[in-house]
Amino acid sequence: MKRTYQPHNTRRARTHGFRARMATAGGRKVINNRRRKGRARLAPTIYKK
């Protein structure tokens, strides 16, 4: 049986990235909650080498 988590940076950014979060009201709430809590990373960032 194939495992469910097959990591891909593109999909990660599209579904959980900052732009995706800002696109919906719920996502904006997530970003604001993480800001309030003082998180260093608000959304998963994909770094270039």
Swiss-Prot record:
InterPro entries: Ribosomal_bL34 (IPR000271), Ribosomal_bL34_CS (IPR020939). This is Large ribosomal subunit protein bL34. It comes from the Bacteria. GO terms for molecular function: structural constituent of ribosome. GO terms for biological process: translation. Keywords: Ribonucleoprotein, Ribosomal protein. Belongs to the bacterial ribosomal protein bL34 family. It holds the Pfam family Ribosomal_L34. PANTHER family: LARGE RIBOSOMAL SUBUNIT PROTEIN BL34M, MITOCHONDRIAL RIBOSOMAL PROTEIN 34 FAMILY MEMBER. One of its GO terms (cellular component) is ribonucleoprotein complex. The keyword Ribonucleoprotein applies.
